[in-house]
């Protein structure tokens, strides 16, 4: 009976904990996905050269109000919660007062970058901003992210 229980435990360990298949009973091997991650580590891989980056279509004849409405929508629907909160609150606060040139710069910022994590790391100043994106709008976004007014941003602002 004891032998049968031991065999069952070994088989279940082999099935449900595959990282311990070759580990001895005394070792405390931790699977890579359960290993602790320190706060100062950024997991960021360079894009391979063979990966084509999509080009964002230029819309030269788009009216300014239509562009602002599109950018407001795109600021809210980024695909990652961090940027959804940062960019939607930024757009709600500043986008309505942007000139045509500032709106074009903001459009290039949020749609010209192929990786949303880059925008997040630049805005939070974890990584340096490339020169082409280090504009007045990015500086304004960085100030917005610092949140000097200590505004609570648990949700996106209401659409008006």
Curated annotation (Swiss-Prot):
This is Succinate dehydrogenase assembly factor 2-B, mitochondrial. It comes from the Eukaryota. It comes from Drosophila pseudoobscura pseudoobscura (Fruit fly). The keyword Mitochondrion applies. Interacts with the flavoprotein subunit within the SDH catalytic dimer. Keywords: Chaperone, Mitochondrion, Transit peptide. It holds the Pfam family Sdh5. GO terms for cellular component: mitochondrial matrix; mitochondrion. One of its GO terms (biological process) is protein-FAD linkage.
């Amino acid at each position: 009976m004891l032998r049968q229980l031991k065999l069952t435990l070994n088989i279940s360990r082999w099935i449900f904990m595959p990282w311990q298949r070759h580990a001895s009973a005394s070792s405390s091997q931790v699977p890579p996905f359960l290993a602790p991650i320190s706060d100062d580590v950024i997991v960021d891989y360079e894009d391979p050269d063979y990966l084509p980056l999509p080009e964002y279509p230029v819309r030269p004849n788009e009216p300014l109000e239509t562009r602002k409405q599109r950018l407001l929508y795109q600021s809210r629907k980024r695909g990652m919660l961090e940027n959804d909160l940062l960019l939607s609150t930024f757009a709600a606060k500043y986008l309505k007062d942007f000139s045509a040139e500032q709106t074009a710069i903001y459009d290039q910022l949020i749609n010209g970058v192929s990786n949303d994590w880059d925008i997040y790391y630049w805005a939070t100043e974890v990584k340096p901003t490339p020169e082409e994106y280090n504009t007045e709008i990015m500086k304004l976004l960085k100030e917005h992210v610092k949140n000097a007014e200590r505004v609570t941003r648990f949700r996106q602002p209401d659409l008006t």
